[in-house]
Amino acid sequence: MALRVDYEGSNDVGVFCTLTNSYCLVGVGGTQNFYSILEAELSDLIPVVHTSIASTRIVGRLTVGNRHGLLVPNATTDQELQHLRNSLPDEVAIRRVDERLSALGNVIACNDHVAIVHAEISAETEQALVEVLKVEVFRVSLAQNSLVGSYCILSSNGCLVAARTPPETQREIAALLQIPVVAGTCNRGSELIGAGMVVNDWVAFCGLDSTSTELSVVESIFKLGEQGAPTSISNQLRDTLIESML
């Protein structure tokens, strides 16, 4: 299911929110409306955590995570880090990384198995992705768009890239990630897909301006609504299958 929401009048819900299969982070804000919508959809399945990162609300652009772990920038305070450790499930590892490209959500897009990253991220950050998020890492750019986290979003079921991404680049990414890739937009034509929406394996939240056509593309590529929330058993089966293939 894909839902339209806004964060205090902003359509850029991916700027203020990080959504994975095991937790959801939401930037602290003045209104409860956005938070309450996410709570209503997610709280039976995963924790929805109100937090700031580096004393800002733009948690979606500063963090990157999946069901295995969460990476936060070096500017994250000790209090914020402790709050996250107390709020997230025990099996979710958290690490603070010293990365020059500190808006991690702009330069990294990942699911539970693979990550595509900006060509210039440090070797230490790449190592943290492997160790904490347990993903295979590929350095790519989407034609002229090196900020892969802003112009691309992926789940375990599919990947949505900016509309002007060349077909050969789409095919290359599909071959690397081993999931379907389609080009599209959100928020009535915006190519900043990572900033305009968040998605996990069973639900997506898109900006309020997103058209019904854009929502149908999102539901199709991410296979939303075809099944309920994945169980821990299905996750373990997929992990076992991938380990046996490596």
UniProtKB/Swiss-Prot annotation:
Please give the GO cellular component terms listed in this UniProt entry. Answer: cytosol; nucleolus; nucleus
Gene Ontology molecular function terms on file:
ribosomal large subunit binding; translation initiation factor activity
* Primary localization class, coarse: cytoplasm
Name the SUPFAM superfamilies on file: Pentein
Give the InterPro entries listed for this entry. eIF6
Q: List localization entries.
A: Cytoplasm; Nucleus, Nucleolus
Keyword Transmembrane in the entry? The reply is no
Q: Mention one GO biological process in which this protein takes part, according to its record.
A: maturation of 5.8S rRNA
Mind listing the UniProt keywords for this protein, alphabetically? Cytoplasm, Initiation factor, Nucleus, Protein biosynthesis, Ribosome biogenesis
Function of the molecule: Binds to the 60S ribosomal subunit and prevents its association with the 40S ribosomal subunit to form the 80S initiation complex in the cytoplasm. May also be involved in ribosome biogenesis. Involved in miRNA-mediated gene silencing.
**What is the similarity comment for this entry?**
Belongs to the eIF-6 family.
Subunit architecture: Monomer. Associates with the 60S ribosomal subunit.
This protein's name? Eukaryotic translation initiation factor 6
What taxonomic lineage is listed for the species of origin?
Eukaryota, Metazoa, Ecdysozoa, Nematoda, Chromadorea
Please state the gene responsible for encoding this protein: eif-6
